[in-house]
Amino acid sequence: MAQYKGAASEAGRAMHLMKKREKQREQMEQMKQRIAEENIMKSNIDKKFSAHYDAVEAELKSSTVGLVTLNDMKAKQEALVKEREKQLAKKEQSKELQMKLEKLREKERKKEAKRKISSLSFTLEEEEEGGEEEEEAAMYEEEMEREEITTKKRKLGKNPDVDTSFLPDRDREEEENRLREELRQEWEAKQEKIKSEEIEITFSYWDGSGHRRTVKMRKGNTMQQFLQKALEILRKDFSELRSAGVEQLMYIKEDLIIPHHHSFYDFIVTKARGKSGPLFNFDVHDDVRLLSDATVEKDESHAGKVVLRSWYEKNKHIFPASRWEPYDPEKKWDKYTIR
């Protein structure tokens, strides 16, 4: 004799709809969480880089006292940058591990809820959902396979309640090293391109009066290379230079005696200034100290002087040689002066 099964079938359909709605709600929550995480990561990029370089600059200023050579300054700056990057890497590693633990706990809660729903609705769905059970079983197996693969990739086979922020993450370290190397190579390529650019240098051979010449150099050339080329140009016109070598010449720029090992690039990238004008321009304009307010930074500069060291020793008590002094990268010139 046939039996009426209407109530059981209606209850099964209702439970099936509830499960579908629960799954849709979980998917929406996951999408919202991913979008929020992406927005937070994007908004923190600029802050992270600016805070990183501000901290390095502050540490460099506080740890540098007195006169320091250019090489020592560069070495100290590189060491501070590396130390700061290690600190940031540790903080980022701790944050990522915390997020992974939160996601793992959330998955455990969802799986527990699914098990409770399945145990309650099993008897009601048994009569009419034979085909649906097979489909759900297949979906459940796929989900378990995905979770197993994800667990293997993330290496989260340990107790999620244990703090593992101090442990190294080889994958992330390799990615950070790769990115750091790419940025270093990109920066070096850009600097090499700048150094290879050609500039025209206007200079004056000074023996009590000026004799102007021009020569083309590259921004990466040193003062010694420049003086060698200038000497080749001047020898045919000045007999006292025919037996002179580069080590006997001095280069005076904006009343500062420039050491031979410095390059034009050093002054260009740092926008260095001298006593009477900028050191980063090597073409010539009228005297910037007489045209307008000499305290305002200008691009105009004076022709650098090429001088025999013997001439300087004899005349260093007489103007203009009396104004000349050795270049010191730590000394700042706030105003341009004539005397």
From Swiss-Prot:
Q: Which residues form the signal peptide?
A: none
GO MF: RNA binding
Does the keyword field hold ATP-binding? no
Tissue spec:
Widely expressed in fetal and adult tissues. Mostly abundant in fetal brain, liver and kidney; in the adult, high levels were also observed in heart, skeletal muscle, spleen, thymus, prostate and small intestine. Expressed in fetal cerebellum and hypothalamus. Low expression is observed in fetal temporal lobe.
GO CC, any one term: nucleus
Report the family membership: Belongs to the FAM50 family.
Specify the protein name.
Answer: Protein FAM50A
